[in-house]
Amino acid sequence: MSLQNLTRFPRLELIGAPTPLEYLPRLSDHLGREIFIKRDDTTPLAMGGNKLRKLEFLAADALREGADTLITAGAIQSNHVRQTAAVAAKLGLHCVALLENPIGTRAENYLSNGNRLLLDLFNTQVEMCDALTDPAAQLDELATRIEAQGYRPYVIPVGGSNALGALGYVESALEISQQCEDAVAISSVVVASGSAGTHAGLAVGLEQLMPQAELIGVTVSRSVADQLPKVVALQQAVANSLELQAKAEIILWDDYFAPGYGTPNEDGMAAVKLLAQLEGILLDPVYTGKAMAGLIDGITQKRFKDEGPILFVHTGGAPALFAYHPHL
């Protein structure tokens, strides 16, 4: 597969140079396995993160349609909403965010610090709801209201996770394969699996470019039974848009997200502290901490296909640390 497959889709150059792919020597020594990390936490805008890859395609489509407003939804501490708001600010667009409080907390840090603080800095119009029970319908209803006020809205789904946004992680797979070429033969790739776009895009790209590497999604919000159909549906939609076959098995581990989305757990927080203390790299309590906990336990329990090098895809999320600091 070549980049030619993606050139049919408008894309904004928001990231620029490839994000680093680094060897983690101290973590590798600690775990007894070669560990590499793809640093998508270092993307430009709003303290970094994976959603910018999706927004390169989604925001380009919004501009193509003549939109003047980006509308999206997520949790109060959503990394996706924060990055969408930053892109809107950069492009001179209005941004409306529909937020929920998925953990039902009244803690002031969660309600006003971290990602939520940054939304105010980006001049985001925030609308609260009791719960995102049907986010697609709720976003459509919000878009109708915003349009009635004279705006031209463009709706971005939760997590930027549709077939168009997930192309950002087909691009990422191309980047990873080029960085690994003649450098390291990655055996396994680990990524947090939430709204499914990042996981699905990587699945399509890596199947074409690094078929020897198993891709493992560590769920952050759902059981395998609930998450698998979401990832598979997006995997197929992305492949269809690129006129490719998607035959790779989707592997999910759901042992590490309890007690639920947005609520830290002991193993996840231990992983956050371990990476900070061994490598000076910041994970987060919601996504990457739990995904790293899965990687660590996967080595201990011998869940990987072999003992070859592992690549951890760091999707960002460090601003949430400031919202969860009592847990640290």
UniProtKB/Swiss-Prot annotation:
Pfam families: PALP (PF00291). Its EC number is 4.4.1.15. It catalyses: D-cysteine + H2O = hydrogen sulfide + pyruvate + NH4(+) + H(+). Its cofactor is pyridoxal 5'-phosphate. Homodimer. Belongs to the ACC deaminase/D-cysteine desulfhydrase family. The modification N6-(pyridoxal phosphate)lysine is found at residue 51. GO terms for molecular function: D-cysteine desulfhydrase activity. The lineage of its organism: Bacteria, Pseudomonadati, Pseudomonadota, Gammaproteobacteria, Enterobacterales. Signal peptide: none annotated. It comes from Klebsiella pneumoniae subsp. pneumoniae (strain ATCC 700721 / MGH 78578). Gene3D superfamilies: 3.40.50.1100. This is D-cysteine desulfhydrase. Keywords: Lyase, Pyridoxal phosphate. GO terms for biological process: D-amino acid metabolic process. Catalyzes the alpha,beta-elimination reaction of D-cysteine and of several D-cysteine derivatives. It could be a defense mechanism against D-cysteine.
